[in-house]
Each structure stands twice: as structure tokens, then as C-alpha cells.
């Protein structure tokens, strides 16, 4: 049931965002506990959420009373829904790597109105989960990743916040049919990252004070070798000039600070109706994964298992102004709109911008 509801939501949301002015124009109602009906269990303040999960039947709705819970949670049952009532925080009890870990047995998982804070690696990790909902979740200072669905599908990340992560605040990796909307990411290396994924949308979000606001990327060495059909629309992407604090040697440590929206190696990516301002390197860039590899000092053969060039990118109807004040890359200028010349079928149309490289950029045929 939840899977079908999420599929319906992900298909209809693009119609909701006709104005595409950002998160404040979202028409979808916020998620509340009432959406899930009568709860099957109530965790009292000071109780154990994990004990409630262990005792629950598949499909159970678990309501969590206000309070701070020092425990790490594991979910391996289908349809579990954890719903916070009031101010609910899950904090690291010691040296736990993951705050909430959901396995591939946890299809239909939902997490609503909860803060996850201070875990060593990941705030919320979903691995192989089909049909998930993360709504009004706040991920704060969780090592590398805040919200981290991987090998997952048919998911919605709605009105979440993520800050203080040395890789990515809100990440979708090697997944398909996922939408991120109405969310805020700040103070991370990457605010939002869509990596080696297809049929994914990032719509109506705000990213600021990250190294890069939104990164859409195809990387080598992963199980999924392609990334296509990505929509980045109606987002506010501004002032992403944070110094890069990723672990030295990690590929994220070579993401250039001052980046608004980066499209790196993916195919058929549409970037439309975003407002992108105040990013010191570039507002919206389209380039090859080989460029990121060059910054990392990797040889071209390191990318032999992927086709690293972006094809079919459409950059339309964006406002990209006040970017490019100071490029950190000697061989590329700081501009509002940037293309490294790689790939085929990439085009730009009806954008409002002050500078581009090259100039002019290729125009779209049948622009929308």
C-alpha cells in the first residue's frame, strides 16, 4: 500500500511544481501522524524505540513520545512506520556508526518527525529498500551522510533538513524512482547528491553554505554503471562556498568549493527553473567525470567501466546570477553557466545569467 502511494506521489509531484519557485510554493500537504491511522504501539518518553520495533508486527505504526533517545535502531521488517510526536531526537549512545539502519527486509519503511544526531557514519541508512518515506527528518552532524538511501527505489524524501556531514547531507545512490522535495541542506560537503541513479528528482529544495549545493554525478567503481533521467527543478541554490572538509583522498575532497549545481557525467539531466546565486566558482556546470578525476589526479583508465561524458543535458529557464567571483580551478573560469565541452546533445535555453563559458552555449531545439 505505501509503495503504491509513494509511486503515485512521485508521478504527480511534477505537476504540483508548475510554478517551481522553491520549497515555499509546495502544494503537497505536510506528512502528519494522522496519515498512518491509529498507531499500533506508543513509545513513552524514556522508553526504547528498538524494543517497540522488535515487538511489532510487519506494517506496524509506532508513535514515539517527545524526548531524547540514546540508541541506534535497526529495522528488518516490512512496513514499519516510526512517527515522532513532538520533539523526538535519536542520539548516538556511544560509538554507533548508523543512527537508523533499514535492510532490504524493510520495504515500505517510513520515518516522520524525528531528529537523528551525532552518529559516526550515517544518520539514516536504507539499503535495498523499496517504497520508503522520510518526512520532516532532521539529520545533524552524522559523520559522512545524513540521509542515505542506496540500492533503493520508489521513495520520497520530503521536507527534511541535513547539516554537518563530511560527504553529503541528502544522498541518493545507485537508486531509482526517488524524489527529494521541500528539503534544506546546509553545512555539508555536498548538500544534495544524486549518484549513479536514474529517474530521480530534486525539486523545490534549498541548499546553502555547502561546498556544492547539488551534485548529480556518475562515478566509476560502483555496481550501477549508468545514471540518466534526472530532474533538478525549482530549487534555491545559493552561497555554497564552504571550505571542503571531506576526508583527505576521498573523491568528495576534490569537489570544488563555490559550486551551485554540478552535472557530472550523467545522461538526460534536466536543470530547470532553479535560482542559483552567490556561488563563488559556478552557478550551473555540466562536465565529464574525467574532469573530477583530473582534479583528483586519477588517470583516464580509472574510468574505464563507465561512459563518463554527459549527454542530453537540458539547462533551461534558470536564474543564475552573481556566481563565479573566484574559480578555484586554474584552467576553468568562474562563471554563472559552465560547460567543459564534453558530451553530445547538451543545450541551454531561456536562462537569465551574467556570464558563461563558452559563450555562446549551444541552444536547445524545441526548448520548453
Name these PLM-found stretches:
Residues 69-75, 92-99, 120-126, 143-150, ...:
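Short glycine/acidic-rich loop motifs that flank beta-strands on beta-rich extracellular proteins
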Residues 16-19:
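C-terminal motif of bacterial Sec signal peptides marking the signal peptidase cleavage site
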Residues 85-88, 107-118, 130-144, 153-168, ...:
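Right-handed parallel beta-helix
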Residues 21-24:
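Bacterial signal peptide processing site
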Residues 63, 292-368:
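Acidic, glycine- and Ser/Thr-rich low-complexity intrinsically disordered tracts
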Residues 44-47, 61-66, 79-121, 125:
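Right-handed parallel beta-helix/beta-spiral solenoid domain characteristic of secreted/periplasmic
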Residues 1-9:
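Bacterial N-terminal signal peptides that target proteins for export
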Residues 36-70:
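Acidic Gly/Asp/Thr-rich repetitive segments characteristic of extracellular carbohydrate-active
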Amino acid at each position: 500500500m505505501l509503495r503504491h502511494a509513494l509511486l503515485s506521489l512521485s508521478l504527480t509531484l511534477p505537476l504540483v511544481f508548475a510554478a517551481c519557485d522553491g520549497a515555499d510554493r509546495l502544494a503537497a500537504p505536510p506528512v502528519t501522524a494522522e496519515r498512518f491511522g491509529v498507531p499500533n504501539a506508543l513509545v513513552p518518553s524514556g522508553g526504547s524505540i528498538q524494543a517497540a520495533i522488535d515487538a511489532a508486527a510487519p506494517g506496524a505504526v509506532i508513535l514515539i513520545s517527545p524526548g531524547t533517545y540514546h540508541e541506534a535502531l535497526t529495522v528488518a521488517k516490512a512496513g514499519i512506520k516510526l512517527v515522532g510526536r513532538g520533539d523526538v531526537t535519536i542520539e548516538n549512545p556511544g560509538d554507533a556508526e548508523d543512527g537508523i539502519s533499514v535492510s532490504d527486509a524493510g520495504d515500505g519503511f517510513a520515518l516522520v518527525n524525528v531528529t537523528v544526531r551525532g552518529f559516526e557514519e550515517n544518520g539514516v541508512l536504507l539499503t535495498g529498500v523499496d517504497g520508503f518515506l522520510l518526512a520532516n527528518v532532521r539529520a545533524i552532524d552524522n559523520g559522512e551522510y545524513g540521509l542515505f538511501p542506496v540500492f533503493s527505489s520508489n521513495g520520497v524524501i520530503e521536507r527534511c533538513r541535513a547539516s554537518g556531514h563530511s560527504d553529503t547531507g541528502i544522498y541518493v545512490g545507485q537508486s531509482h524512482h526517488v524524489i527529494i522535495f521541500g528539503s534544506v541542506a546546509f553545512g555539508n560537503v555536498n548538500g544534495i547528491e544524486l549518484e549513479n541513479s536514474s529517474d530521480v528528482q530534486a525539486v523545490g529544495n534549498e541548499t546553502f553554505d555547502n561546498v556544492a549545493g547539488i551534485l548529480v554525478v556518475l562515478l566509476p567503481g560502483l555496481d550501477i554503471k549508468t545514471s540518466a533521467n534526472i530532474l533538478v527543478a525549482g530549487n534555491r541554490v545559493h552561497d555554497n562556498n564552504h571550505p571542503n572538509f571531506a576526508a583527505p583522498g576521498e573523491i568528495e575532497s576534490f569537489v570544488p568549493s563555490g559550486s551551485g549545481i554540478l552535472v557530472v557525467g550523467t545522461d538526460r539531466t534536466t536543470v530547470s527553473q532553479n535560482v542559483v546565486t552567490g556561488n563563488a566558482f559556478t552557478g550551473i556546470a555540466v562536465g565529464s567525470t574525467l574532469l573530477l578525476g583530473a582534479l583528483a589526479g586519477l588517470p583516464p583508465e580509472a574510468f574505464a567501466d563507465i561512459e563518463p561524458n554527459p549527454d542530453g543535458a537540458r539547462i533551461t529557464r534558470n536564474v543564475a546570477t552573481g556566481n563565479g567571483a573566484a574559480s578555484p580551478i586554474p584552467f576553468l573560469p568562474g562563471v554563472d553557466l559552465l560547460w567543459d565541452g564534453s558530451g553530445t546533445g547538451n543545450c541551454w535555453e531561456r536562462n537569465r545569467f551574467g556570464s558563461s563559458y563558452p559563450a555562446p552555449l549551444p541552444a536547445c531545439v524545441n526548448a520548453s
